[in-house]
């Protein structure tokens, strides 16, 4: 749940269409201080649902969808090489977990998938990767920002706790 903090704002809405399912997806990019951007996406067909970030389309094309989100991230990075990114991997809905042997304590299936993709696609030279597996938050913090002290893990953790009224603890992925 978000706090009443008005520093959170949606900077851009991006759209793309899947070449496989032909479904249109919306990517929301939220801007925070210190060049930090939160990335969210969902299928346009469920945009009014409170569960829009958790709903599965069962089209089995997550890699294509995530690659499209990464293209959005890269566009921000090309414009400003000091940007950092974060996202929350939405929890699986109860109906999607029925009958499946899934360890929800180590993060959602989405979280594990996103984590694997980010570690494989982005090296440690550019982004310091950290996470909170309990709350399925994944961060890619710009190394230049960290090394100059412009941002710290503690700053980001505090901001997450303030904005989303939570108790987030960021663990380093290195």
Name the predicted role of every residue range.
Residues 1-174:
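Non-catalytic substrate-recognition and accessory regions of acyl/acetyltransferase enzymes
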């Amino acid at each position: 749940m978000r706090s009443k903090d008005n520093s959170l704002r949606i900077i851009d809405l991006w759209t793309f269409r899947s070449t496989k399912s032909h479904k249109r997806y919306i990517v929301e990019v939220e801007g925070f201080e210190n060049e930090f951007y939160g990335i969210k996406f969902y299928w346009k067909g469920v945009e009014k649902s409170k569960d829009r970030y958790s709903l599965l389309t069962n089209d089995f094309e997550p890699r294509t969808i995530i690659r499209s989100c990464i293209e959005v991230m890269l566009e921000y990075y090309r414009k400003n090489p000091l940007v950092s990114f974060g996202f929350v991997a939405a929890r699986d809905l109860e109906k999607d977990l029925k009958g499946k042997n899934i360890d929800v304590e180590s993060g959602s299936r989405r979280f594990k998938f996103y984590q694997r993709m980010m570690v494989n696609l982005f090296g440690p030279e550019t982004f310091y990767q950290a996470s909170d597996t309990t709350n399925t938050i994944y961060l890619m913090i710009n190394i230049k920002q960290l090394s100059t002290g412009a941002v710290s893990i503690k700053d980001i953790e505090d901001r997450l706790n303030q904005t989303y009224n939570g108790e987030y603890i960021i663990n380093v992925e290195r």
